Swiss-Prot record:
Keywords in alphabetical order: Cytoplasm, Nucleus, Phosphoprotein
Start and stop residues of the HEAT repeats: 99-137
Protein name (record): Testis-expressed protein 10
Organism: Mus musculus (Mouse)
Source species, domain of life: Eukaryota
SUPFAM superfamilies the UniProt entry points to: ARM repeat
Protein family (similarity comment): Belongs to the IPI1/TEX10 family.
């Protein structure tokens, strides 16, 4: 075949037959495989680009869109910023400057949706930005806010109040620092200045008049209500910040108590004696002096940049001159003279709200004036300029009530009634009347009482009726009410009128179910009245019967209140302590009657309240008229149960000693204050550390880990917890001190050993702390004049061996009981050294033939330690024959086995300290 023919064969078309499958090509790709998706949740390699939101826009993209001409784009950018910052909060700190500058710039945007998105974003950002972080940028924020408040567009002004609400909530100190500008803005929001030539020479109070803008979406009255509500919040933040500043500078305490020191030094003499507390004698003598002064450093800026805020009386007076006439106009607009005749039937909701905000602003201005008016010059100036206007406009129709108006519709009438009722409940006409009363009585004093008697009597009648009306008052209403009552009591010399007012307050105090803030305010009010009466001289002192009745009922209230309200209980205790220290007879009588409930060891206030209140209650024991046996029994239980701290229990024991006849003080009031028998019974009960019932329950314990049992002693040892042991040991030292100061040492020793013989001898289970404390007291009381009861010696010997056996069998891993070893070893050795008969009886009880094989090494170790101890060496030498016999019996029992190391050591010690002594036994051949 020619080459041309072969070339044609390469391009021949294959003819396919119908019904036959197409043959597969040689280079065909196989498609019969399966695939699975691979999910990558994150990239291992970090992307250096900025995080993006759902629209893949980062922070720079979103901030750049804030400059777009379209309002929709800017709104979308603000919403995207909120979405991005909620997903990546760390961006806020990194781009805070740019975020604030762009967001605040749209406060004055002409698009309402953009402004709404900006307010929502600011509401989201404010809780996440701390004050110290936003502080450098706050002048910019304040400038944009001021621009929005003074903008000519009504919608921008309305939205600026929303921004102000956010800043007042989260940054009150920063926003009130710009008060010089913002206060002017508030004035301009509701008024405008007259610029006519005839008014140039007028004062600034007459150059401002209320403005009316018909283009607003709300009425002028509703707009003023919004502005006045924000102004009230702003002044409240300003007043709170001013009071905190004055308290930090120490001015508040100096004003109330001029002779008191602002800084007190609390000294713990135990810590000072151990060089654990350093005392700085001079207040400003440390490395960092803290000087409290009434003077402030003046600003070094130029005179033209002085901040005209309300921190000085002159600036405050200037603002009052501008705002008070405007507030009076708002009042007249809300309550026109032509409608004044119908005020008796009540004022509608919206005008009443305006009146409430007017009074709130005036009240806060009065509060600011009191903080700065140290010479009472502002008070007289306010009375001179505004008392006449206030009486004419405010007091002419006092008190005011709410007029309920129910708007009914043809459809859904019930829903309309419900909606109207909810709105009406937001208006507190009682608080309005109380605020007005507070403002008015602050303008009066005792010297002007005769001139102001008419309207003061009206306020007094209203206050008395409100207190006796039985209405449930909240803390805000009651605070105003008690403030007015206190002012009336201060300026009123008439005792009958004062008594009626106090009686009205007491009527409110007797209501059940009062909330904690309400009850606290009432207690503080009565306490203030009582302290005021006590400060007077005895001749001029007037004791109110109602106040005496209230004071006498406090102990019973405290006994029932307990721990249900610790704060209220603390306030009651402070008042009771003050009255008891001043020997108020009625209170002391009722305190005596309620003492068993107050000092109950299970549920009494003395064990359930915090430590500070417990200390005050313990101190009250010094003022109780009598201390009967049942009360002393409860006090003993309080000491030993551990519900009182060891130091407080020691204080209690010391107070009872001062009340006893052994203190050497003469008791002229009542010789039967506390009998000696009851006092000594209290000391012994506290010394044992356990009640009779608890000791009886312990006798049934056998075979438990807390009980140490030995075959050579009839007394079993109950192991107490370490905390209980240390607490018992601390109060035992106080009991020892109380017994040591009794002049007749031998008599107190006889009483103690008689009590031990009666209540402890015969018990088979004794707590380790009780045995150790008994030994400690006997060692300290024992002297040459004391005679030990023979029947007591076997019990002491058995307890001593049980304690020593417990100490010698302690394991190194038992860290809790190892801390008891030194204290118990010391008292055991001391009792054996002071009472040789106890040592002899203990040695006689060591019948090793009855001991278990595990106990023999313990007996041998005990004998070796007793031989090595120097204070006991002479007594061991006296009992050498007895010791020799015990060692012989031990050696006999161990003769069948290889001699152990402990037995070799025992033989060596015996040969050194007994056999080697000149007075020792001469023949020991049977043993060696």
């Amino acid at each position: 075949m020619t080459k041309k023919r072969k070339r044609q064969d390469d391009f021949q078309k294959v003819k396919l037959k119908v019904g036959k499958k197409k043959p597969k090509l040689e280079n065909a790709t196989a498609t019969n495989f399966k695939t699975k998706a691979i999910h990558l949740p994150e990239q291992l390699k970090e992307d250096r680009t900025l995080p993006t939101n759902n629209r893949k826009l980062n922070i720079k993209d979103l901030l750049s869109q804030m400059h777009h001409y379209s309002g929709g784009v800017k709104q979308s950018a603000l919403l995207g910023l909120k979405d991005l910052l909620s997903q990546y909060p760390f961006i806020i700190d990194a781009h805070l400057s740019n975020i604030l500058s762009e967001v605040t710039a749209v406060f004055t945007d002409r698009d309402a949706n953009v402004r709404l998105a900006a307010v929502q974003l600011l509401q989201f950002l404010a809780p996440k930005i701390r004050t110290e972080h936003i502080s450098p940028f706050f002048p910019l924020v304040s400038a944009h806010l001021s621009s929005a408040m003074t903008h000519i567009t009504e919608g921008i002004q309305e939205d600026s109040l929303k921004v102000l609400d956010i800043l007042l909530e989260h940054y009150p100190a920063l926003i009130t620092g710009r008060s010089s500008i913002l206060l002017k803005n508030f004035v301009e929001l509701i008024s405008h200045q007259q610029l006519s030539k005839g008014l140039v020479n007028r004062d600034r109070s007459q150059s401002w008049i209320l403005s009316v803008n018909p283009n607003r979406r709300v009425t002028s009255q509703q707009w003023r209500l919004k502005v006045l509500a924000r102004l009230s919040k702003f002044l409240q933040a300003l007043a709170d910040g001013s009071s905190r500043l004055r308290e930090s500078e120490g001015l508040q305490e100096q004003k109330e108590t001029p002779h008191a020191t602002s800084n007190s030094i609390f000294i713990n003499w135990k810590d000072h004696a151990n060089d654990q507390q350093q005392i700085q004698v001079y207040e400003n003598g440390g490395s960092q002096p803290n000087v409290s002064s009434q003077f402030r450093l003046r600003c070094l800026g130029t005179l033209g940049t002085v901040d005209e805020d309300l921190s000085s009386p002159e600036n405050l007076k200037g603002f009052i001159e501008i705002i008070i006439p405007l507030l009076i106009e708002c009042w007249i607009e809300a309550l026109p003279p032509q409608l004044a005749a119908s005020v008796g039937s009540g004022v509608e909701r919206e005008p009443l709200q305006v009146m409430q905000q007017v009074l709130n602003v005036i009240s806060l201005l009065w509060k600011l004036s009191k903080q700065q008016d140290e010479t009472h010059t502002l008070e007289s100036w306010l009375r001179k300029n505004y008392l006449t206007d206030f009486k004419h406009h405010f007091m002419s129709h006092f008190p005011y009530a709410l007029k309920e108006i129910t708007k009914q519709r043809k459809k859904d009438t019930n829903k309309s009634i419900k909606h109207c009722t909810v709105l009406s409940n937001n208006v507190d006409h009682l608080l309005l009347n109380l605020t007005l009363s507070d403002i008015m009585v602050s303008l009066a004093n005792a010297s002007t009482l005769q001139n102001d008697s008419s309207w003061i009597e009206t306020i007094r009648k209203f206050v008395t009726e409100t207190l006796k009306g039985g209405t449930r008052l909240n803390s805000k209403q009651l605070n105003r009410l008690l403030g007015v009552s206190w002012r009336l009591i201060q300026m009123q010399p008439n005792r009958d009128a004062t008594e009626n007012l106090i009686k009205a307050v007491y009527t409110l105090y007797q209501q059940r179910g009062l909330l904690l803030p309400v009850r606290t305010l009432l207690i503080k009010f009565f306490s203030k009245i009582y302290q005021k009466e006590e400060l007077r001289s005895y001749r001029l002192r007037y004791r109110s019967k109602v106040l005496s009745r209230w004071l006498a009922g406090l102990p019973l209230q405290l006994s029932y209140l307990g721990s249900r309200n610790p704060e209220l209980s603390t306030q009651l205790i402070d008042i009771i302590h003050t009255a008891a220290s001043q020997a108020n007879k009625d209170l002391l009588k009722n305190l005596q009657a309620a003492a068993l409930r107050i000092y109950d060891p299970q549920e009494g206030a003395v064990v359930v309240l915090p430590a500070e209140s417990q200390q005050r209650l313990v101190q009250l024991l010094y003022f109780l008229p009598t201390l009967p046996a049942d009360l002393l029994s409860q006090l003993s239980r309080c000491c030993i149960m551990g519900r009182l701290g060891s130091s407080l229990a020691v204080t209690l024991i010391g107070i009872l000693y001062m009340r006893s006849s052994f203190s050497g003080w003469s008791h002229s009031v009542n010789d039967c204050l506390m009998t000696d028998v009851d006092y000594l019974s209290f000391l012994f009960s506290t010394l044992t550390g356990f009640s009779k019932e608890e000791l009886t329950w312990l006798q049934n314990l056998r075979g438990v880990p807390h009980v140490v049992q030995t075959s050579l002693s009839p007394v079993l040892l109950y192991l107490t917890d370490l905390d209980q042991f240390l607490h018992h040991w601390d109060i035992t030292e106080a009991v020892c001190h109380s017994l040591l100061v009794i002049p007749a040492r031998s008599q107190s020793f006889d009483i103690m050993q008689s009590a031990i013989s009666k209540h402890l001898v015969g018990l088979t289970v004794i707590p380790d702390s009780t045995a150790g404390c008994i030994f400690g007291v006997m060692c300290k009381l024992l002297d040459h004049t004391c005679v030990v009861n023979e029947a007591l010696l076997p019990f002491l010997a058995s307890c001593c061996y049980s304690l020593l056996y417990f100490l010698l069998t302690l394991e190194k891993g038992d860290a809790e009981h190892l801390k008891k070893r030194d204290k118990l070893w010391e008292v055991c050795v001391s009792i054996l050294a002071l009472l040789p008969r106890v040592l002899r009886l203990m040695l006689q009880s060591l019948r090793v033939n009855r001991a278990s094989p595990e106990e023999l090494p313990v007996v041998g170790q005990l004998l070796r330690l007793l031989l090595q101890h120097v204070p006991l060496r002479s007594h061991m030498l006296t009992n050498a024959i007895l010791v020799q016999q015990i060692i012989k019996n031990i050696t006999t029992l161990k003769s069948g086995s290889v001699q152990e190391q402990w037995l070799t050591d025992l033989h060596y010690c015996f040969s050194v300290y007994i056999s080697g002594h000149p007075q020792g036994p001469s023949i020991l051949n049977a043993l060696y």
